[in-house]
Regions:
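A short alpha-helical cap/connector motif
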Residues: 1-129, 135-156, 160-170
Length: 170
C-alpha cells in the first residue's frame, strides 16, 4: 500500500518536479538550482566519511544534503537547530557556512530547551535560519522564535506529516 501511495504522489507531482508551472523567477531558481541540484558539492565526501550517524534513519543523507544546499544558498549569519535531527544534519548545516553562528538545542527537556532557546534568541537578536527538527514542542519553539525572524529568514520544519495535528498546524 505504501508503495502504491508513493507512486501516486510521484505521478501527481511529476509535472512540477523541475519547476514547471512556477512563475516566480526566484522560486524557479531555488527549485532547479538548490532543491533538485544533484552535482557533488565540495564538502559532501568529507562529511560522509566523518562518522555517519544511523540513529534516526528517517533523516536520510539526501535530507542532510538538501539542508547543506539551502544554507549554502541563503548564506545565513545565524542558525538555530532545535530538536532531534540525527547529528549529521547539524554537521552538514554548520559546514555549509563555517562563519555563521550555529546553535543546536537537542536532547533537553522542554522547559530547559525553551529557556536556552530564549537566551540564544536574545543573544543573537535575529535568526537567519531556523531548523525545527523532530521535537514534540515544535509549536512553542516556532512561537518563541517568530519575533526574531525577518523577511530574509529561512525556516525548515522536519516531520510535517508525522501526525495529523502537526500537519494541521503546518
Amino acid at each position: 500500500m505504501l508503495l502504491a501511495q508513493r507512486i501516486w504522489n510521484w505521478c501527481r507531482r511529476f509535472r512540477y518536479r523541475c519547476g514547471y508551472g512556477v512563475h516566480s523567477p526566484s522560486d524557479f531558481f531555488l527549485i532547479t538550482s538548490v532543491v533538485y541540484e544533484d552535482l557533488p558539492y565540495y564538502a559532501y565526501e568529507r562529511l560522509k566519511m566523518s562518522s555517519p550517524s544511523k540513529s534516526l534513519p528517517h533523516y536520510r543523507e539526501k535530507v542532510n544534503k538538501l539542508l547543506f544546499r539551502l544554507v549554502n544558498y541563503f548564506r545565513p549569519m545565524s542558525l538555530i537547530e532545535v530538536g532531534e535531527g540525527n547529528g549529521d544534519a547539524f554537521r552538514y548545516i554548520s559546514n555549509a557556512r563555517t562563519s555563521m553562528i550555529s546553535v543546536s538545542l537537542k536532547g533537553l527537556e522542554k522547559i530547559e530547551t525553551l529557556h536556552r532557546l530564549e537566551m540564544e534568541l536574545k543573544r543573537l537578536e535575529k535568526v537567519d535560519f531556523l531548523h525545527i527538527a523532530f521535537t514534540p514542542y515544535y509549536k512553542e519553539v516556532f512561537e518563541l522564535a517568530f519575533p526574531y525572524l525577518h523577511d530574509e529568514s529561512c525556516v525548515v520544519v522536519g516531520g510535517i506529516y508525522t501526525s495529523e495535528e502537526r500537519k494541521t498546524w503546518w
